[in-house]
Amino acid sequence: MALRQIRLSEDEILRKKSRPVEVVDDKIRQILDDMLDTLQNTENGAAIAAPQVGILKQLVVIATGEDIIKLVNPKIVKKEGEQEVVEGCLSIPNVYGKLKRPKKVTVEALNENGEKITLTGEGFLAKCFCHEIDHLDGILFTDLVTEYIK
């Protein structure tokens, strides 16, 4: 188990675009495992993107309940509907805000074995997909907030 330091909002790495992963190898799988360990060591985190642990690669880990999703080079290929959500972020502790996200999204990515996968998420999972893929483009949820929650 390797815990990585979560980068905070003032870290400029969070504003940079992540690079696609060329080959899904043991090194990439280790980073994904470290990201999962780091996520599971947080108080109430549901997902994490590689830039949040200082790595500019297109990697995302989502842990919702018993489901663990590891994504390499994820791209949103379809959005449906709209929902108002409340979000927070491991990189911006104790800040929460309302924003609009698609109600349903479809994502294409590679899994940790380098196989192409397509996943569709609704509600909370759709929000996670959008939030984490935004991180890969240097976008923080605070860029999209319509109202902060005290």
Swiss-Prot record:
Removes the formyl group from the N-terminal Met of newly synthesized proteins. Requires at least a dipeptide for an efficient rate of reaction. N-terminal L-methionine is a prerequisite for activity but the enzyme has broad specificity at other positions. The active site is at residue 132. Binds 1 Fe(2+) ion. Fe cation binds at residues 89, 131, 135. One of its GO terms (biological process) is translation. It catalyses: N-terminal N-formyl-L-methionyl-[peptide] + H2O = N-terminal L-methionyl-[peptide] + formate. NCBIfam families: pept_deformyl (TIGR00079), PRK00150.1-3 (NF001159). InterPro entries: Peptide_deformylase, Peptide_deformylase_sf. The keyword ATP-binding does not apply. Belongs to the polypeptide deformylase family. GO terms for molecular function: metal ion binding; peptide deformylase activity. Keywords: Hydrolase, Iron, Metal-binding, Protein biosynthesis. Its EC number is 3.5.1.88. This is Peptide deformylase 2. It comes from the Bacteria. It is an enzyme of class 3 (hydrolase). The keyword Iron applies. Pfam families: Pep_deformylase. The lineage of its organism: Bacteria, Bacillati, Bacillota, Clostridia, Eubacteriales. Its cofactor is Fe(2+). PANTHER family: PEPTIDE DEFORMYLASE.
